[in-house]
UniProtKB/Swiss-Prot annotation:
This protein's record includes keyword Cell cycle: no
Residue runs in coiled coils: none
Co-factor requirement: Zn(2+)
Alphabetically ordered keywords of this record: Metal-binding, Ribonucleoprotein, Ribosomal protein, Zinc, Zinc-finger
One GO CC annotation: ribonucleoprotein complex
Subunit description: Part of the 30S ribosomal subunit.
Zinc finger (C4-type): 36-58
Organism (species): Pyrobaculum aerophilum (strain ATCC 51768 / DSM 7523 / JCM 9630 / CIP 104966 / NBRC 100827 / IM2)
A molecular function (GO) term: structural constituent of ribosome
InterPro entries referenced in this protein's UniProt entry, alphabetically: Ribosomal_eS31, Ribosomal_eS31_arc, Ribosomal_zn-bd
Positions contributing to Zn(2+) binding: 36, 39, 55, 58
Lineage top rank: taxon: Archaea
One GO-annotated biological process of the protein: translation
Record protein name field: Small ribosomal subunit protein eS31
Amino acid sequence: MSKKAPAQKEKKLPRAATWYELDLEKGVFRFKNKLCPKCGSVMAFHKEPVPRWHCGKCGYTQFQR
């Protein structure tokens, strides 16, 4: 019996429009997410179990009030 090769998935790259906000009046791009104060990487927002911002690179966490 012949084995089938696994189907290759297309990689979907994130669009820059999802990362930035554009202010047309001022002509300025602004980053939507927070940057880590320790290492400068982009922080991710998590809703469960407690709302918080977390840096995956250095482990820094800011809890929401």
